[in-house]
Amino acid sequence: MTDTTINNADKVAPTLVARVLNEALPYIRRFSGKTIVVKFGGNAMVDDALKQSFARDIVLMKLVGFNPVVVHGGGPQIGKLLERIGKHTEFVQGMRVTDAETMDVVEMVLGGLVNKEIVNLINSQGGRAVGLTGKDGGMIRARRLRLSHQDAAEQPPEIIDIGHVGEVEHIDPSVVDMLDHGAFIPVIAPIGVGEDGLSYNINADLVAGKIAEVLEAEKLMLLTNTPGVLSKQGELLTGLNPARVDALIQDGTIAGGMLPKIRCALDAVAGGVNAAHIIDGRVEHACLLELFTDAGVGTLIQRR
């Protein structure tokens, strides 16, 4: 074999690249100038290769004319730091009881460590990311979330206060709009401020959904640790509408940790977002695969 010999893999690669770019072109045209809200979480936040591929995806979106907005979680990172400092926390109905001291740690981790790491990742790939919390510019006004528990039907429900855990009361999109329609990529930590002046930790999926609604986003993309919504047989359900989702909830197909994500997606599309996607964040370049290929990846939820 001489130095000028080209193997089969080398012959295929340029053709494959051309085919992929050709398939992507209609989507680039379609979504140019549109806002895409991406919730970054799960394994994608702790695996170095996945973090790098995510950052490249976000930068490429901006380069081809999309307006990406990133909202991130950070529960595992919060748990690790609390454990390191010897701070014990309890969970009620899957939510962390958050006193003032714990909230200080939450703000430190979400608004500092995690947020700035994501900003740095995007900037290292040529983007211009700006880190924010919901407190910046009064972006997210929160109200305290109270849970209820009822032991017997005839008894009034017990109201449970879990501290500095909130839900979204109002979104002011002006800061995000200013950044997103310029050269910048907003990266948002899900911390809001209440009328009482206190900070509240809010579920990142819910924040992403509400921001997508207010920005009238084209798409909401939720990165998860599953391929998407699965049938009882474990098969991926690639497309759903609200009626189908309701039926799957009723028969128990959609349950557990997928429930809040699917409800977030439904609320977003009901609020005007064109489409919501629940995609596998464990797959490299999952965002690009969903945006730029005919097959897509994960589960698509639309109004119709």
UniProtKB/Swiss-Prot annotation:
Positions annotated to bind substrate: G74, G75, R96, N201
Location (main, coarse): cytoplasm
Enzyme Commission identifier(s): 2.7.2.8
Function: Catalyzes the ATP-dependent phosphorylation of N-acetyl-L-glutamate.
Domain of life: Bacteria
Gene3D superfamilies assigned to the protein according to its UniProt record, in alphabetical order: Acetylglutamate kinase-like
Catalytic activity line of the entry: N-acetyl-L-glutamate + ATP = N-acetyl-L-glutamyl 5-phosphate + ADP
Protein name in the entry: Acetylglutamate kinase
Subcellular location: Cytoplasm
Cellular component terms (Gene Ontology): cytoplasm
Keywords, sorted A to Z: Amino-acid biosynthesis, Arginine biosynthesis, ATP-binding, Cytoplasm, Kinase, Nucleotide-binding, Transferase
Pathway: Amino-acid biosynthesis; L-arginine biosynthesis; N(2)-acetyl-L-ornithine from L-glutamate: step 2/4
Enzyme class per UniProt: transferase
Gene that this polypeptide is encoded by: argB
InterPro entries the record matches: AceGlu_kinase-like_sf, AcgluKinase_fam, ArgB, Asp/Glu/Uridylate_kinase, Glu/AcGlu_kinase, NAGK-C
GO annotation terms (biological process): arginine biosynthetic process via ornithine; L-arginine biosynthetic process
Family of this protein: Belongs to the acetylglutamate kinase family. ArgB subfamily.
Feature type site, description Transition state stabilizer: K39, K261
Single Gene Ontology MF annotation: ATP binding
